[in-house]
């Protein structure tokens, strides 16, 4: 994975952004399930972590937006996580989250990754091993 910054992510189309997130998840040790088409209930990626205790099925939504992610979007993700009996949901964006969306996610199996966290994670995972 080449070095990347928020400016280059902001210029990506949605499909390329999803591909980047898929590669990131693989680097993090997840196994990616192919997602088929637009009738996905808002799911961009289904990922599995097979680690005992902390592992499970994860539903990932990738949002390459120019405005903050709303509470409504997080509520939708939570509904899908519940319906699909996933252990966790991730909303990964190049943007930020509204305070209402952050508050809604608290105490729920939802992880929010904004643009700053995404860049830090990409930088951490693309550094050479010593």
Language-model regions, residue ranges each:
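Mixed-charge (Asp/Glu-Lys/Arg
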Residues: 1-130
């Amino acid at each position: 994975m080449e070095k990347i910054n928020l400016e280059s992510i902001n210029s990506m189309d949605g499909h390329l952004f999803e591909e980047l997130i898929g590669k990131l998840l693989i680097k993090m040790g997840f196994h990616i399930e192919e997602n088929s088409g637009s009738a996905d209930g808002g799911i961009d990626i289904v990922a599995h972590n097979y680690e005992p205790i902390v592992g499970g099925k994860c539903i990932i939504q990738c949002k390459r937006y120019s405005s903050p992610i709303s509470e409504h979007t997080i509520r939708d993700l939570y509904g899908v996580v519940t319906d699909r009996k996933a252990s966790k949901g991730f909303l990964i964006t190049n943007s930020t989250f509204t305070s209402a969306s952050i508050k809604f996610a608290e105490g729920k199996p939802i992880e929010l990754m904004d643009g700053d966290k995404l860049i830090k994670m990409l930088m951490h995972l693309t550094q050479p091993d010593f």
